[in-house]
Amino acid sequence: MKAPFTSLAGFRAVFETLPQVDAEAVEAATARNETLTKPKGALGRLEELAIWYAGWIGDGRPALERPQVAIFAGNHGIAARGVSAFPPEVTVQMVANYRAGGAAVNQLCHVAGASMTVTELELDRPTLDFTVSPAMTEDELVAALAAGWEAVDDESDLLVVGEMGIGNTTAAAAIAAALFGGTAAEWTGRGSGVAGSALEAKTRVVAEGLERHADALSDPLEVLRCLGGREIAAMAGAIARARVGRTPVILDGFICTSAAAVLHALTPSALDHAIAGHVSAEGAHPAALARIGKEPLLDLGMRLGEGTGAIVAINILRSAVACLSGMATFAEAGVSGG
């Protein structure tokens, strides 16, 4: 679907008339769940997940058949400041690895039965160093938001977004600090594996960016423009598109959460269609999830990004939906109810 906006004002307008969850589907799914051949509540959070999914899909007996994983790749000017354990050229190299099927995300998509798309966002033109100037112009931000919006398959019934971009945990830390408050040190973690003096330098870069753009940080989209990256903006655009289309979303790690947090700061209901697939080993992720009101499904010590933790959670949601829609009721099975 072509993005219905050509400016940041147009993107903001998207959130003025967001569709609501289908209350009739929620009621039907809840009623059906009460009649299934199990003690009430015996499937725990799986029951909540299935009813949540039913409401957004709009079907009291839903199916999960077309999950999409949308990966976005972008390069960051701040990567030249040595904030990552890997050089900037790794972004392009990893995109090639995705297309060749050799990355972890490819294997996990196969196991989860998910399609995978990769969108490259001007990899030959990194964003600017946000300690010197805004990372993006307004036009560049709008283009990245639109690229994310248009990458979503209208036929998908679940969306996971992931990212590749050397330096993007630095951008995510800056976004989180700007949106949530606190110091650069509270939000800056090891990312790709930096430690010691390298982590200290990364933290200084985040602090410098926050100071440089202090006058712009009361506006969530200005936070994204000044401190973010194209792939982070594209994830925000994709999540927004899913919200408008009532497509459920599973959020991934810290970088994905920073993108989602921008939307949450615009209006908290922007993330009603989203759940957190996991909590990552990036130190600030639990705090970021708490700030947007999301309880993670998994805690596996993962910190790869790229959508991987959320993809692992797809089969948890698939299991929940299968039980709601496939189990027999007490009446159908001829089993006496409790």
Swiss-Prot record:
CDD domains xref list: DMB-PRT_CobT
Catalytic activity: 5,6-dimethylbenzimidazole + nicotinate beta-D-ribonucleotide = alpha-ribazole 5'-phosphate + nicotinate + H(+)
Pfam family of the protein (one): DBI_PRT
Catalytic residue list: 306
Keywords: Cobalamin biosynthesis, Glycosyltransferase, Transferase
SUPFAM superfamilies for the chain: Nicotinate mononucleotide:5,6-dimethylbenzimidazole phosphoribosyltransferase (CobT) (SSF52733)
EC number from the UniProt entry: 2.4.2.21
InterPro entries: Nict_dMeBzImd_PRibTrfase, Nict_dMeBzImd_PRibTrfase_bact, Nict_dMeBzImd_PRibTrfase_N, Nict_dMeBzImd_PRibTrfase_sf
Protein family: Belongs to the CobT family.
The protein's name: Nicotinate-nucleotide--dimethylbenzimidazole phosphoribosyltransferase
